[in-house]
Curated annotation (Swiss-Prot):
Compartments in which it is found: Cytoplasm; Mitochondrion
Gene name of the record: PPM2
Species for this entry: Saccharomyces cerevisiae (strain ATCC 204508 / S288c)
Protein name: tRNA wybutosine-synthesizing protein 4
Chemical reaction(s) catalysed: 7-[(3S)-3-amino-3-carboxypropyl]wyosine(37) in tRNA(Phe) + S-adenosyl-L-methionine = 7-[(3S)-(3-amino-3-methoxycarbonyl)propyl]wyosine(37) in tRNA(Phe) + S-adenosyl-L-homocysteine; 7-[(3S)-(3-amino-3-methoxycarbonyl)propyl]wyosine(37) in tRNA(Phe) + S-adenosyl-L-methionine + CO2 = wybutosine(37) in tRNA(Phe) + S-adenosyl-L-homocysteine + 2 H(+)
Gene3D superfamilies, alphabetized: Kelch-type beta propeller, Vaccinia Virus protein VP39
Domain of life: Eukaryota
Binding of S-adenosyl-L-methionine, residues: 38, 88, 115, 146-147, 196-197, 224
Enzyme class: transferase
Short name of one Pfam family: LCM
Amino acid sequence: MKNLTTIKQTNKNVKQERRKKYADLAIQGTNNSSIASKRSVELLYLPKLSSANNFQMDKNNKLLEYFKFFVPKKIKRSPCINRGYWLRLFAIRSRLNSIIEQTPQDKKIVVVNLGCGYDPLPFQLLDTNNIQSQQYHDRVSFIDIDYSDLLKIKIELIKTIPELSKIIGLSEDKDYVDDSNVDFLTTPKYLARPCDLNDSKMFSTLLNECQLYDPNVVKVFVAEVSLAYMKPERSDSIIEATSKMENSHFIILEQLIPKGPFEPFSKQMLAHFKRNDSPLQSVLKYNTIESQVQRFNKLGFAYVNVGDMFQLWESADEATKKELLKVEPFDELEEFHLFCHHYVLCHATNYKEFAFTQGFLFDRSISEINLTVDEDYQLLECECPINRKFGDVDVAGNDVFYMGGSNPYRVNEILQLSIHYDKIDMKNIEVSSSEVPVARMCHTFTTISRNNQLLLIGGRKAPHQGLSDNWIFDMKTREWSMIKSLSHTRFRHSACSLPDGNVLILGGVTEGPAMLLYNVTEEIFKDVTPKDEFFQNSLVSAGLEFDPVSKQGIILGGGFMDQTTVSDKAIIFKYDAENATEPITVIKKLQHPLFQRYGSQIKYITPRKLLIVGGTSPSGLFDRTNSIISLDPLSETLTSIPISRRIWEDHSLMLAGFSLVSTSMGTIHIIGGGATCYGFGSVTNVGLKLIAIAK
């Protein structure tokens, strides 16, 4: 008879085994989401790309589909997820291309997919009908490694789908099929082998069985978001084991948290995987690009090429990027920046003769910028559950009005905000007029001096449905009146009031002039683009502000319509209402890495101090010390207005799609804002305010 201790130990072991099984299934579940997203790319992107950028085409330029065998249902993801997954496909394919291009023809290459899931990569590259993979056909073989339960399903699909069986030779020689091992498949160019990668001994045994220690064989290990769920010491043992084999390459694509676990996107991403019982583990130890380099060097790979996914996007040639921009309407650049900076692509090798060629080389290094702290201002919480983004707000008289935006659906309501010390109350304005603007976002809503009125300019419905209509809202009568439309659509532009009551409009996604002036008296729009080469292209989502005391304005950051380049300049200009031919002239241009912001908002605190808040950058993430900064335009000095640790760690914070408003109390409020964090859920701002510190 078993004693009580033995029974308790047995029960404990059963529970541990059950927990492990559940965790394994949760990790396998992440594969289902990933492969469905790649199917979305296969359906939407690949048919629209030319042969130069399509991974899957036959000799008649017909699209070959491989993901459909594992995801038969037609899937459509959001534009940001689609672009992100196209980039993931490009990441692995481009690294494999670089290896095969530099490997001598007489060398055999084996690609080992660690945690392969339902990835059809072997079938893409071995299919002799696929002219885009001709260089792989006679040179490469594949080994798929994953959990036994998952491989059983994958192998059963391979056996029952003639197209897949034929690619790897199953239909030609039944001897390769071993029905006694349903998680085990062997053909001349394709092996499927079960392995729990948490078991380093099992993995080493498998490497031996597959004869991968042969120095004449080039080994390429691919880990696309598969080691990230393992404890660092276990994933490290996998990497180290592969480094002990001559002629070995390791390609890893996984999550990154370069500004720590409390950066808003990072916090949401970590929480998402934890909720799904597949917590990210390695990323907490190897959270930066530098730490990944050190990791692979320490584990035996002397030569490492590593960068984040936006660096990969930048490395794609211009023709490819232009073609991708045409695939589907896209207006999620802030979210794309955030996604890209949270994924790392690393190619490591122990083969000293291998050269990372220019087309594949990540060579940008970013140094940390330390700023002195601005002791005059601090950021506090201020309850404002507006739950909207990409609307606009302005002060008219003693009232604050917020118009439009999305929550997540586009709206055309006007909210009246009553600002108190620690909270903001809001109510819907009941509009008297029967004719009202359509729901929209990415517009401007700007005070004009004439009788407490607000000017609504442009905006958009869907990303491909820009608007050209303009309206004036009268706060006394609560009526909308439509004014002359623009000759072009315009959204993601900026606008500010000028001392004479006119309104300056800058840039946006438009085919119109780079700068317009709305003359309130004449009720016309006039092209006032400065004669400066900087304004040859329209600036998108730039910061714009004018100071009536110094009679100068500032334009900060802003992107261009290539969706890659973002300005790192602050342009100081003056406005001369008497100069009919050239009312806007550039005085000075300042340049700084922290000016490189897309979607930031700026506001003068004093004529000698400009507040710069939020936005995203192609160069990296902002943190709690540089998300909010101040600029003295005269001395050209920058200071930090740090976000307190308590707000950074505990507050719902996302400095994208928000607005700034100054109040008569001398405070500046961050109103609205938020972003969808890729497939990890949305984050919205609750409310923040900037106050002067009493001396």
